[in-house]
Each structure stands twice: as structure tokens, then as C-alpha cells.
A protein has these predicted regions:
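A structural motif
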Residues: 156-168
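A cross-family acyltransferase "interaction/gating" segment
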Residues: 161, 172-258
Length: 278
């Protein structure tokens, strides 16, 4: 979504989606009807109205305005599990692809202040200027893996509490239901080396079935391009009136967890399993 966002540099106008403008710039030969079709797919008009309503909010204020406008009911439990001291990593499953991050920013920004939370995201999302104050870029598309690692390292070495989706991708429908893919071990290793405590977060929500069907058919047809990602903006709009249930689970010392389960991938999988355990 973020690659199709334009923003008035004077910040006298809200962030707005402009599919046709981006296509004219990046692929000038594409017919106008294709641009109009894509604008409908991402629900450009509805998103732009939502962004106008949220303007001029930023950070957690922007996020709360989005949730309020969409009439999202956020039910939170497990607050008592959040430690009062230390630098924390809020590691959550990633069921939605947009509103889950917005909701966590709203909740944790209100609790700690925006200046005390940091959310590593791929550098494309840095186009979402109202959230630049809490985002920090990791170069997912960089030539070298160490560029990505350095962005994460800066986030973990800083003083703020880290919000992260260890899977890196939106949950998919599988034999066990809607579940994250493998949680990358990097978040756990960096939490351990920087002396952080992990707070696993269970985020109960889902996209519409058509999103999961598209992902399944793309995989069956061996299409390498992540087509379903183009439908995530529409899923955000379709969430109007829904209820999200968020549970903060008991904290885990990253260093102690790795000592008990020294294989990093298995240790990351164990924390993922905590999120889905009942």
C-alpha cells in the first residue's frame, strides 16, 4: 500500500492515495482503465476519506483516529503481564496486515508515549508519514542482508520498547486455521543480546476469506508475486465495526529462553506457539 501514497510536503493536507499518479510515474504505458481498476481494488476513495478524517493526527493519535472512524472495538486483557521495568519487545502475530500494527501503536503509544515505542518496518512503509515518528526502516529490499540487520539492531539497541511482527508476513490459512508463518529467529537473538524481555502478544482478528483464497491459489499456481498484498488496503476498510481481542501474555526473558532452548529457530517457534496456545 505504501508505495502508492503521496503526501503534501507542506503537511497542510492529509496523506492521500494516488494510484493513477504512481502508475504514470512508474509504468507510463499502462492504460487508464487499469489504473481505475487498481484504484477500485485498493478502495482508494474510501481510504482517502479515512486518511482525511485522521489528519492531522500522527503516531498513536493518528492510529486512534483510524480505529475510532472504523468503529473498531478493541478488547484488551493481560495488562498485568506487562513488566513495569526494563526494555520490552512486544512480539505479536500478524493477522491483518495493517490494522493490527495500527492498533498496537494506539495502545502502546498511549501507555508509554510515542517517543518511547519503536516499530521496525520495511522501508516502503516509511511513506506513511503520520507514523514516521514511531516507525524505523529496515531495508527489506536492500542488496545486502546486513543492511536489514543494522536497522533492526538500531531499534533493539535504543531505549524504546520495540513492537514487532516476527513472521514478517501476514498470517495465512492453513490446516490449523489462520496462523503466522515461521517466526524469524532474529528478534529473539537481538532481544537476548540487548538484554530485553519479550512480551508475547496474541492478536485475535482475521481478514476476509477471499484474501486467504487468493493467497492459496497464488501458491498453487506458483506465482512468485505476492498478489494478495494488493488487497490488504481493502481488508482494512472491510474491518469496519469489528472487534479485535488482544492478550498480553506472561513475559519471557530472551536470554534465559535461549539458554533453555539453545536452537534459535526452535526457541522462536516456542514463543510463536505460546501466542496460539489455549
Amino acid at each position: 500500500m505504501s508505495d502508492t501514497l503521496r503526501y503534501c510536503e507542506t503537511q497542510s493536507a492529509p496523506l492521500q492515495l494516488d494510484v493513477a499518479g504512481i502508475l504514470r510515474k512508474r509504468a507510463p504505458g499502462i492504460p487508464g482503465f487499469v489504473a481505475r481498476l487498481l484504484a477500485r481494488i485498493v478502495r482508494q476513495d474510501e481510504l482517502n476519506r479515512l486518511l482525511r478524517v485522521a489528519f492531522p493526527g500522527a503516531g498513536s493519535d493518528f492510529s486512534r483516529r483510524i480505529l475510532r472512524e472504523l468503529d473498531i472495538d478493541v478488547q484488551v486483557s493481560g495488562i498485568e503481564n506487562i513488566p513495569d521495568n526494563g526494555r520490552l519487545v512486544f512480539a505479536s502475530n500478524h493477522p491483518l496486515g495493517g490494522l493490527d500494527g495500527i492498533t498496537l501503536i494506539a495502545l502502546l503509544g498511549e501507555r508509554y508515549g510515542d517517543e518511547n515505542i519503536i516499530f521496525p518496518v520495511n522501508d516502503m512503509l516509511m511513506h506513511v508519514r503520520p507514523l514516521q515518528g514511531v516507525f524505523t526502516p529496515i531495508n527489506k529490499y536492500g542488496r545486502q542482508g546486513r543492511e536489514r540487520a543494522s536497522g533492526l539492531q538500531r531499534a533493539f539497541e535504543g531505549g524504546g520498547h520495540v513492537i514487532i511482527f516476527p513472521a514478517g508476513l501476514v498470517s495465512r490459512l492453513g490446516p490449523e486455521g489462520i496462523r503466522d508463518l515461521e517466526w524469524k529467529k532474529t528478534f529473539l537473538a537481538m532481544a537476548a543480546t540487548t538484554g530485553r524481555t519479550i512480551v508475547p502478544v496474541r492478536f485475535e482478528a482475521r481478514n476476509r476469506m477471499r484474501f486467504y483464497r487468493l493467497a492459496r491459489w497464488r501458491k498453487r499456481l506458483r506465482i512468485p508475486v505476492n498478489l494478495e498484498q494488493a488487497f490488504l488496503p481493502a481488508e482494512l476498510c472491510a474491518a469496519r465495526g469489528r472487534t479485535f481481542r488482544i492478550t498480553f501474555l506472561p513475559p519471557v526473558s530472551a536470554a534465559a529462553h535461549l539458554d533453555a532452548c539453545p536452537a534459535p529457530r526452535a526457541a522462536a517457534r516456542a514463543i510463536r506457539d505460546m501466542v496460539y496456545a489455549r
